[in-house]
């Protein structure tokens, strides 16, 4: 009688333990990137997230939709940024919080991780500022009867008129969603898998108004430039769109993002799937 071998189809996505292992490997790669390459990839990520932010503010300039629908669809527009980061390849500070998995498994050192974080944070900011320059020179803010410019000021002003602690906790919530989106994207085996997996977590954090430090590297300078050009004069809090206001927001959002991504997501999943049992 002939022997029949039963072949089972490969799973459509990685299991959580395999995602953690892949995340550790990615952390090692990130930690060993030459500074110039890491910085350039970080600039790409800052630019990509800025593209998502631009798409978001252009959409928000149309006030015909109700508040809830506008936030949800605007969040879907913003997804463009992380889709470009994951599919095209770039170094995003918030996603790099997951390097803690590699750190805890002693595959990289604390110095390597912190160095990578600093290089990527600065690179993200430079990339975002470059897009602010391009958007200004291209006159995108003049669209929809200059309503886009007012939308840019409104979004930015809303981020500098809340207290530091609130921004910090919104930053924690934000990077929980972002790192889970990256986690899902890592699980996917095709471009479609990655894109679909990203949509809901990213749309949710944007719709809820959480604080993403890299997105704010675009939103805040863009709003400040528009306010300096005379737009959004009647927007509450617009006068706080200056260097101090930007630093105030980014300090809280950055620290909150680190706690949300590195401590709550990365450390949690490392403990579950990679921590060695003690005899």
Where are these regions (language model features)?
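Alpha-helical transmembrane segments and their helix-helix packing motifs
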Residues: 2-279
